[in-house]
Amino acid sequence: MAPTKERPATKTIATNREARHEYFVLEALETGVELKGTEVKSLRAGGVNLKDSWVDIENGELLVKGMHISPYDHGNLFNQDPMRARRLLAHKSEIRRLHQQCKLQGYTLVPLSLYFKHGRVKMEVGLCKGKKLYDKRADAAQRDAKRSIDRAVKSNGKYY
């Protein structure tokens, strides 16, 4: 019998690339996601979109809103509303701390990525501060400069 291959502990389902473009991520927090019915099967099939989602704190609970989980193809009657608010699982002390920072300092909670960790669905939530237009321009200029330097270094060692 052949030896079994170890599966990786984490498998990324979706990332919110727009969040890193629109916000400065000050801190990241791993939370669990409360899902119902066939939503996990839909996530395994890759049917999720984090692009326009955000995290709210209501009644001492973290809720992710605007996250679209596609209905499972074979779910029929048991499928949930694709845009429903889903509860995130975190310690009360963490929720209180995040609530204070959002309320007093004007930060925002944004989902950064969704992944499986040892068979459980986890979400990385970022405590973020919005970028201004000039910050985005500076990031783009820095990225272009890095690309041109890498290109020059790579082409320097080639023969003509």
Residue ranges, per PLM feature:
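Flexible glycine-/small-residue-rich
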Residues: G37, I57-N59, G66, V125-K129
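Intrinsically disordered, Lys/Arg-rich N-terminal extensions and targeting peptides
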Residues: M1-T31, K36, D144-Y160
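C-terminal end-helix/capping segment
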Residues: M83, A90-R96, G130-Y160
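Short, surface-exposed beta-strand-loop junctions and turns on beta-sheet-rich folds
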Residues: K41-S42, N49, D56, I69-Y72, ...
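Beta-rich strand-turn-strand
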Residues: L89-G126, G130-K132
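A structural signal for short hydrophobic beta-strand segments in well-ordered beta-sheet cores
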Residues: S53-I57, L114
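Short, contiguous, helix-prone interaction/anchoring segments in small proteins
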Residues: E30-V48
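Helix-adjacent hinge/juxtasegments
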Residues: D56-L98
